Amino acid sequence: KKVLGLDKWYRGCIHSVYPSTTASSITSILTGLTPLEHGIPGWHTYFKDTSSVINILPFRQRFCLNNSKIGNSIPDHYIHFSDEARELTKQMLSLQPNYLSETIYSKHVSNHAIRQSYRDYREFSDVLESFMKGDSGRAFAYAYIPSIDTLSHKYGQHSTQVDVEAEVIGKTIRKLLKIAELNNTSIIVTADHGFVSNSKRRTVATQQHPDFQRMLALPLCGEPRTAFAYIN
């Protein structure tokens, strides 16, 4: 919150779900359910009815020679919603970067929402400002900024690249918070999960453990920080 410059609006800490990854936590935010309930414990999830590991974002088999999509939509029984979340999406604006807004996953979890995309933070701000000033009555907007997550994975959460990006994002959010105060609007700003730095010394490579590899019925699922092993 310090780098973002949001101390004035800070209200306290909340805890992420487990696994504390983007796939699990964003799905929890949009479904109102825990990962155990909604069924997505990681980007790479094993589904029995296809007998394969699926990358849920593009809805592709993880290990496939032609890298083709399994279908044009995710079956309803793959991701579960609370009744409240399902109703909320019917009056929701979903705002995501243009490279994410039309993915099969995004379309599924925002099935009934008005989906819009943005190319930069000016467009991001303009869309939300228009939403807050609009005469639409009671409504809800979900807006996602992935760049802190992306840069933290690449450079580390304490890197200069992350700090510079956070300052730009903070400026955008502070402007929107001030507009919200004038338009009877509440804004909740939160991360979907946190970060813990790791090192190569503390990273286990399965290639170095052939006995363990021989026990696996499938390649590891989930994600590196929370991997799931299906064993023979």
What is each PLM-predicted segment?
Residues 1-232:
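Feature captures the catalytic ectodomains and active-site-proximal regions of enzymes
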